[in-house]
Amino acid sequence: MEESTPDFSLIVSNNDQAAAQALARGDFVQAYLLVHALIEALLRLFLSIPDGKDISFNDLIHKYRAYLEEEHYPIPTFIDELTQFNQRRNRLVRQLWRKGFSFTNRQTEDAARMAVMMYGLFIEWLETFDPEITRMGFRYDDGD
């Protein structure tokens, strides 16, 4: 039996909606982790990394840096932000087992809100290289 390919735009839309709902109801850990998954998916798609390929977020950042260098882009835009974003995710996961969900969730509000903002800015930035990126389900708030 042949496995069908999932509609990636529906998955992205579902995760995007779940992140927004988590943020609205104060589930900041969940919102942060969902945004992390969305940014990972965005990088994988943008860099044409096959879905089944096992690659770390850190390696995705390195591949993104290489892409910018290939494009002769002089400024490593979003490299530091993505690195700090991933490091914060790792700290957040460690905090869950060290200090528990309630404490970690309270401490994650600002980070979750910034993650959502960075996600939108990153989509807008990548769209300058690939205008089709939003057709894949990734969207940002353009104020409309």
Residue ranges and their predicted role:
Residues 41-48, 67-70, 88-91, 95-98:
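Amphipathic alpha-helical interaction surfaces
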Residues 75-144:
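Charge-enriched, short contiguous segments at helix-coil
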Residues 5, 17, 21-25, 68, ...:
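Residues at structural and domain junctions
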Residues 32, 64-67, 73, 119, ...:
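Sequence-level detector for tyrosine residue identity
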Residues 1-2, 71:
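A short, mixed-charge helix-start or loop-turn motif at secondary-structure junctions
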Residues 2-62, 132-136:
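Amphipathic alpha-helical interface elements
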Residues 47-78, 83:
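Short, charged amphipathic alpha-helical segments flanked by flexible coils
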